[in-house]
């Protein structure tokens, strides 16, 4: 090969290496910062929650979920940053495999949830009922439930009768809340003052007799129907979750391939090693500590 062509090939190889390195560093750094932000928000929310803590269930503590998500994102992304800066093949492979495993688990989870749709709905309804039992004791769940009921015009998990699980709304309770639902279940007229007693004495009534006073459909079905009707938003959410992970796996795979090629080319073209030691260097290039000098 003429010298000019050889130099051009080396330049193109070097350019692709630098482009992939830059892309992977930016990718990892962005998600590292996002992970740190999520972790910080989760810690702050948990500190605030501890002031009023009465429950132990992680389902009822979004702060715990944020902390776990933030820790995973922070650690995995830091591995990606370190691996891409140091060209550490072991860390690069670990980063790629972790992203790939997370992506596969999410895909399998989504498929299983669709196949066992009824069981998934029952699982959600059971968890909502457990949250309703402690509605007035856990501020996190109360805020989430109130928001969902107002925005999606629904009441309870399966239906409005789920509120009988709460000790204050149970029809056998002695207080004024007995047999009622929270005011966030009520039909609202924005021009009128909010009537917090609008849902009283409704749980023991038939659906037809209260459907003009409160929302009778459950929030689980209401949210699922909303996503079904707004499938473009649902598709966007799924792409927003899955596409970055797929992009990370692809970038890391291409970068690993390029680093391995450059390690081999560097060893051969420099003529520093004999035939007997070349294989050993190639084997070391796929190990945990071989870095290409920059």
Swiss-Prot record:
Similarity field: Belongs to the tetraspanin (TM4SF) family.
Positions on the Extracellular side per record topology: 45-62, 115-235
UniProt-listed GO biological process terms: protein maturation; regulation of membrane protein ectodomain proteolysis
Gene name linked to the record: TSPAN15
Transmembrane segments: 24-44, 63-83, 94-114, 236-256
Source organism of the structure: Bos taurus
Major subcellular location class: membrane
Top-level taxon of the source organism: Eukaryota
Post-translational events: Palmitoylated.
Subunit structure: Interacts with ADAM10; the interaction influences ADAM10 substrate specificity, endocytosis and turnover.
Keyword terms: Cell membrane, Disulfide bond, Endosome, Glycoprotein, Membrane, Transmembrane, Transmembrane helix
Name of the molecule in the record: Tetraspanin-15
Entries under Pfam families matching the protein: Tetraspanin
UniProt-annotated glycosylation sites, renumbered to this chain: 118, 189, 230
Residue ranges, Cytoplasmic side: 1-23, 84-93, 257-294
Membrane topology: Multi-pass membrane protein
Disulfide bonds: 154-219, 155-185, 171-179, 186-198
Compartment annotation: Cell membrane; Late endosome membrane
Any Gene Ontology CC annotation: late endosome membrane
Function: Part of TspanC8 subgroup, composed of 6 members that interact with the transmembrane metalloprotease ADAM10. This interaction is required for ADAM10 exit from the endoplasmic reticulum and for enzymatic maturation and trafficking to the cell surface as well as substrate specificity. Different TspanC8/ADAM10 complexes have distinct substrates. Promotes ADAM10-mediated cleavage of CDH2. Negatively regulates ligand-induced Notch activity probably by regulating ADAM10 activity.
């Amino acid at each position: 090969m003429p010298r000019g062509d050889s130099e051009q090939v080396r330049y193109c190889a070097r350019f692709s290496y630098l482009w992939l390195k830059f892309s992977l560093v930016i990718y990892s750094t962005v998600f590292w910062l996002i992970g740190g932000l999520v972790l910080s928000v989760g810690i702050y929310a948990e500190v605030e929650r501890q002031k009023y803590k009465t429950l132990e269930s992680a389902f009822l503590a979004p702060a715990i979920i944020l902390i776990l998500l933030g820790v995973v994102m922070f650690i995995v992304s830091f591995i990606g940053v370190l691996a891409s800066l140091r060209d550490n093949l072991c860390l690069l492979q670990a980063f790629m495999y972790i992203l790939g495993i997370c992506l596969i688990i999410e895909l399998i989870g989504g498929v299983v949830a669709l196949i066992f749709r009824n069981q998934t709905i029952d699982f959600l309804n059971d968890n909502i009922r457990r949250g309703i039992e402690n509605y007035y004791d856990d501020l996190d769940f109360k805020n989430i439930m109130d928001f969902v009921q107002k925005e999606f015009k629904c009441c309870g998990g399966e239906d409005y009768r789920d509120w009988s699980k709460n000790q204050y709304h149970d029809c056998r309770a002695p207080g004024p809340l007995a047999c009622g639902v929270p005011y966030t279940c009520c039909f609202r007229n924005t021009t009128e003052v909010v009537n917090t007693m609008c849902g009283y004495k409704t749980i023991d009534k038939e659906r037809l007799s209260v459907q003009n006073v409160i929302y009778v459909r459950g929030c689980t079905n209401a949210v699922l129907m909303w996503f079904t009707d707004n499938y473009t938003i649902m598709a966007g959410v799924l792409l927003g979750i899955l596409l970055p992970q797929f992009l990370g796996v692809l970038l890391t795979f291409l970068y690993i391939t390029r680093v391995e090629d450059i390690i081999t080319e560097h060893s051969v073209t420099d003529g520093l090693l004999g035939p007997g030691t070349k294989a050993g260097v190639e084997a070391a290039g796929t190990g945990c500590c071989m870095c290409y000098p920059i």
